[in-house]
Amino acid sequence: MQRPFLLAYLVLSLLFNSALGFPTALVPRGSSSSNITSSGPSSTPFSSATESFSTGTTVTPSSSKYPGSKTETSVSSTTETTIVPTTTTTSVITPSTTTITTTVCSTGTNSAGETTSGCSPKTITTTVPCSTSPSETASESTTTSPTTPVTTVVSTTVVTTEYSTSTKQGGEITTTFVTKNIPTTYLTTIAPTSSVTTVTNFTPTTITTTVCSTGTNSAGETTSGCSPKTVTTTVPCSTGTGEYTTEATAPVTTAVTTTVVTTESSTGTNSAGKTTTSYTTKSVPTTYVFDFGKGILDQSCGGVFSNNGSSQVQLRDVVLMNGTVVYDSNGAWDSSALEEWLQRQKKVSIERIFENIGPSAVYPSILPGVVIASPSQTHPDYFYQWIRDSALTINSIVSHSADPAIETLLQYLNVSFHLQRTNNTLGAGIGYTNDTVALGDPKWNVDNTAFTEPWGRPQNDGPALRSIAILKIIDYIKQSGTDLGAKYPFQSTADIFDDIVRWDLRFIIDHWNSSGFDLWEEVNGMHFFTLLVQLSAVDRSLSYFNASERSSPFVEELRQTRRDISKFLVDPANGFINGKYNYIVETPMIADTLRSGLDISTLLAANTVHDAPSASHLPFDINDPAVLNTLHHLMLHMRSIYPINDSSKNATGIALGRYPEDVYDGYGVGEGNPWVLATCAASTTLYQLIYRHISEQHDLVVPMNNDCSNAFWSELVFSNLTTLGNDEGYLILEFNTPAFNQTIQKIFQLADSFLVKLKATWEQTGN
């Protein structure tokens, strides 16, 4: 049997998110155009580079200078190219491009006497101004005459690691490692040539890819290192007609570093039985390839994403349901009605939340600190308290309420203290036994007595969510300087942690890998939501131990539990993420048989765990493609399931349910329906995505590969997004650029559209 969550807590969270005062420069909500506009003209020509470096070479000395030794040599190369500026006059209707290509090689001799070398082809491209006039679309070719030779300075270091083996008196074999660097420097002069160039039309853009190299260390293990590579191209755009002259200013220098440094270790046992470990720092050459002809997106002078002139990639329009156009390409996003409704609903939501927490004038039978799931006592009867619902409600109050009512929080702590120590159908409470199994009981009466009727037990997410909420209360008490007094069985934040939180953490340590019912109380197994909130609770708790406690056995158990849960979640063998699906699977044991695995609870988990940047080191962050693609697939499936979504457009928020196969209607089994909780979860995900990028000033990174990891971006945000094959390519929208700001605006409007759907439904039903 299923019952609804206390939905107001999440609505409250969303209202605060949607009303965030983002800087208008970053979220231009009133813009009337869906096009990306370019920045102002630049006066400096650009240089662009294509690098390709050889891999390292392993050689065996032919001499017997170092008996039994092997030498591993790798070439690291730093190339600096200087382009001497010239005065160039060209027609404004065409930019012209000049390309000079040379191959640079470096040679050196290592200490073993071997000669090694590495070569790099170097391509230098310069571009002259282009026109911004929309009517000037003609193409032509331009011949650029040779001017001044281009000199390339190459500094090459040959890194050699040698080792030799000897036998000490007594039979012990030892190995000695020596690392030597041999620098070489030389000049290469490139004679200028005449070059015929072809017209393109684009403005500043940054393209970033991640390049990885892999090698095998002396222990036979495969190691790898990755390096991000950014190429920025700049083409000045004129604002007039006729001829445009770019005056020589200063040399344009492009410096490229092309090595990935990794540290390798190998362990072995010598003849004396002693285990030894050696460490080697290795420079691994990598190959960077940038092809401007395969659909990487530039930002054009015309203000839209161009795909080499063959097609245009534009932000999708957002058109709302029920015949109400909230935004289209010819008008502005009208958010005033939504903002007014949010302010009213915010006030109502806060009032309703506190009415459901004892002591309540509306429901006098609720004991102080008890959070009821619903005031409904018949059809259905949810006049109970759930550990999960209570924790999520309190968490929302502490996180988002301007006045969290400290006495209410202390009363909630008091309820938690006593419920932990109350016997129930799962076992004895804390104090009667050291076994924590009874903490998995999810449902309690409003008078704090145990609910003893049959139910889905245990539910292992409750203690974790309670820990997360209480840790936030501890922070609030410390920040506000609240005096706890002697009214409750805890007189300090240390008491709260030791007497309540520590027991919930012990439950997680003991039972995280045990089966339990999911948050919908329907399936007994291992669940993504449960595991991720357990991981978060353990991770957050570790910062609350003082220096003397951090080496204690309990803290080490917590660290080990954190490692174990993290590994379990991301291991493809466990099914939460695998190659078959393009989304997170909530309960793998029933995927492919009873359900698709799609479930709104995965977004609820990500929203709860990653509510602050400090949790970004944990898996499945808000910007994780798996999280965003889960939202995309939920929208894709539920758009056609529920009749209320019939008039919704493809790139617009819809009413969402729990999972596509749901048959619970809120009271009985028949036909599933959308839920306020689920619909708001979608908005929360997008709001947190926006907040993360703006608050931390992060660039937007859009996957460009074709393994479906960019489904959210290609099908909800952009049109005609070209992929780059199987390589890990990315489109980078730099922070606070026009492209970044307008993309953020579209995501913001998509987030708002879920709430607009909710608003329209509530108004139609009189709520």
UniProtKB/Swiss-Prot annotation:
Record region (Y subunit): 692-767
EC number assigned by the record: 3.2.1.3
Q: Which GO terms describe its molecular function?
A: glucan 1,4-alpha-glucosidase activity
InterPro entries cross-referenced by the UniProt entry? 6-hairpin_glycosidase_sf, 6hp_glycosidase-like_sf, GH15-like, Glucoamylase, Glucoamylase_active_site
Q: Which GO terms describe its biological process?
A: polysaccharide catabolic process
Q: List GO terms (cellular component aspect).
A: fungal-type vacuole
Name the segments for region: H subunit: 348-691
Positions annotated to bind substrate: 455
Q: Which residues form the active site?
A: 518, 521
Identify the Gene3D superfamilies for this entry: 1.50.10.10
Q: Which residues form the signal peptide?
A: 1-21
Can the keyword Hydrolase be found in this entry's annotation?
yes
The record's listing under Pfam families reads: Glyco_hydro_15
Q: Where is the composition biased (Polar residues)?
A: 49-66
Region (Disordered) residue spans = 29-83, 125-149
Which UniProt keywords are given for this protein, alphabetically ordered?
Carbohydrate metabolism, Glycoprotein, Glycosidase, Hydrolase, Polysaccharide degradation, Signal
Q: Glycosylation: which residues?
A: 35, 308, 322, 414, 423, 434, 513, 546, 645, 650, 720, 741
- Catalytically driven reaction(s): Hydrolysis of terminal (1->4)-linked alpha-D-glucose residues successively from non-reducing ends of the chains with release of beta-D-glucose
* Stretches with biased composition (Low complexity): 30-48, 71-83, 131-149
Q: Which family does it belong to?
A: Belongs to the glycosyl hydrolase 15 family.
> What name appears for this protein in its UniProt entry?
Glucoamylase S1
**Organism, scientific name:** Saccharomyces cerevisiae
The record lists the lineage as: Eukaryota, Fungi, Dikarya, Ascomycota, Saccharomycotina
